[in-house]
Swiss-Prot record:
Residues 8-34 bind DNA. Residues 5-73 form the HTH merR-type domain. This is HTH-type transcriptional activator SoxR homolog. GO terms for biological process: response to oxidative stress. It comes from Chromobacterium violaceum (strain ATCC 12472 / DSM 30191 / JCM 1249 / CCUG 213 / NBRC 12614 / NCIMB 9131 / NCTC 9757 / MK). SMART domains: HTH_MERR (SM00422). Pfam families: MerR, MerR-DNA-bind. Keywords: 2Fe-2S, DNA-binding, Iron, Iron-sulfur, Metal-binding, Transcription, Transcription regulation.
Amino acid sequence: MEESTITIGRLAKRTGVAASALRFYEARGLIHSVGEAGKTRRYRRDAIRRVSFIRVAQAMGMSLQDIGAALADLPSQRTPTADDWARISQAWKPLLQERIDALCRLRDQLDSCIGCGCLSLERCKLYNPDDKAGEQGCGPRFLLDEKA
């Protein structure tokens, strides 16, 4: 194949992402291969920057769904530019702030709730009579959701 493409193994090595994860990203439409030479998937070189973009966004706590929505606005044969990143990051700032706020609430409650040993069912936020929190969905609602 031409030199403008790289194998999945080379893409994995260049980005630090396992080949299985790259296939997962491709199945989700986040990256696109341009064919196969033998039985090896090949990618355009711009896939290196797209995968790097995905890794940075994941490190920020963005879901693959959010990342996919952002990348969907870009042509598949182009990497995000500085202007693209500025636009995307502006859209993500409120989501990131929500996560920061939730983590701060959790941090502030750690000393008083987890392992406190108070055994006070009247004031303990972890107490859940009749499993009322179950109506709100799965997970530790009292610690992660201020509305609980």
